[in-house]
Amino acid sequence: MRAQDGRYSILELSDQGRRAGVIDVHRSLGVLADDPEGFVAAIADPAHRILTLTVSEVGYCRSARTGTLDVERDDVRSDIADPTHPRSTIGLIARGLAVRAASGAPITVLSCDNLQSNGRATRAVLTEFLHASAASGDVLNFVDNHVTFPNSMVDRIVPGTTAQTVADVAGLMHVDDRCPVPAEDFTMWVLEDHFAAGRPAWDRAGAIMSDEVEAYELVKLRLLNGSHSLIAYLGLLDGHPTIADAWAQGFVRDAVRTCIANEYLPSITLPRGFDVDVYVDSLSHRWANSALGHRTS
């Protein structure tokens, strides 16, 4: 991305065809392992108002057994012993906030990972770390009163980048993009509108600002993820290599729709104003998208 001045392309895949567009929002880039001090300084900089996280579940340093801070991890133990030279993601964020506390400038830490109640989980594990590493009362008060952790939910199928992705972008845009991102043409981003120092007008681009993020999460987990697994299991057993191939089978569609109606929907409370019929119809289109090449195995 450095060689491309922070630019990359999104390749949207659908059965109606492929289209590509350029994302040009990054103004500086860094590799955390190469420059942890730069990361800490960026968090501490009062000019920066939102820290977004896409670090995968392992980046939160949570125990798979308890959901709390995993103090058995080597990097976490090291950071607790010496919080001024952190190695873990949570340790680095904690250090950045500790330095920022001197200015008192509010900031939002926005998790965008597939983690239930991700904002609440991030706050909890970070607070645990601060206490374990003997953070000062000033730092603890700053995090309590001037740092917010909104819950959010992201829903978009993003396959891995392949040589075909690069070739498709080159054919559509006549550029040699070394880091394109393929994705389906469906997007849903739901966020709590709880930002400590303002936010961009993401809602104008389609983001849903809601105090019911957890309800949206359950819709995704049960209706999308649960059904997706059922399609994969039935499709694989019936000899179909992709989700789209499996969804084309009548018995698979019948089984999934029956589960949605009789098992999944009765187990959740829908968000206010949520049109479940429209959402289920969109799921059908997503599962039928053969351009994604999603495997059943």
What are these regions (language model features)?
Residues 1-297:
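Substrate/ligand-engaging "lid" and interaction regions
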